[in-house]
Amino acid sequence: MQTDIFDVVIVGSGASGGTLASHLARRGVKVAIVEGGPRVNTRTDFNTHAMPFDFPTRQVPTMRPGKVGFDSERSRGVGGKTMLLNAVALRLSQRDFKGRTFEGAGEDWPIGYKDIAPYYDTIEREVGVCGNRDGLEDLPDGIFLPPVPLKCSDEILRRAARSLGGQVIHVRKATLTVPTKTRLACHFCGNCMAGCDVVAKYNSADVHIAPAEQSGRVTV
């Protein structure tokens, strides 16, 4: 029996696994991804526009202490949790890395924001992150697509916040507001945590793993 030889084996095909496999494949590395679930088609396998009572599956039992409420959405399949995440994509700031310096609590990381900023740039270009450059110290600006338009209720909230000296900004999400060759732009259906049938929202299966498989250097 012939045995395939791989340079790297990655366990899990979510955001980390998919991104790593994609970048290794571009550098000529032969990669195997070990995934415990099936392949999922985000366009057809989710009841994206259905109500919860229309779902054919039952809730997965979870261990809960007493009556403490805990909601956990899980995904086992190619793409992992990226199939269900809401895709809010915020950069950590220098304050996050240097908690003791700024807040007097915790420990400072041995790296700072400037060390990983170039990697934020790279991944934002790859997956497509929408938002505004708001110039906030705690939420560093990135490489953004145009933001998702505010709803009427958002405008009301923003006016109220301004009257109190606060600020409301557009959400920063790994969601396309401008179409690409392989993905459509968001049409604001509000079901980001149920697949995304136009792949406007990032998922590692479509954005990273599928192209990597087409290169012939990645096997799931």
State each model region's role.
Residues M1-K114, P118-D121:
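N-terminal glycine-rich phosphate/pyrophosphate-binding loop and immediately adjacent elements
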Residues F102-T219:
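Conserved redox-cofactor binding core of oxidoreductases
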Residues V11, I33-V34, I169-V171, V220:
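General beta-strand structural signal in soluble alpha/beta enzymes
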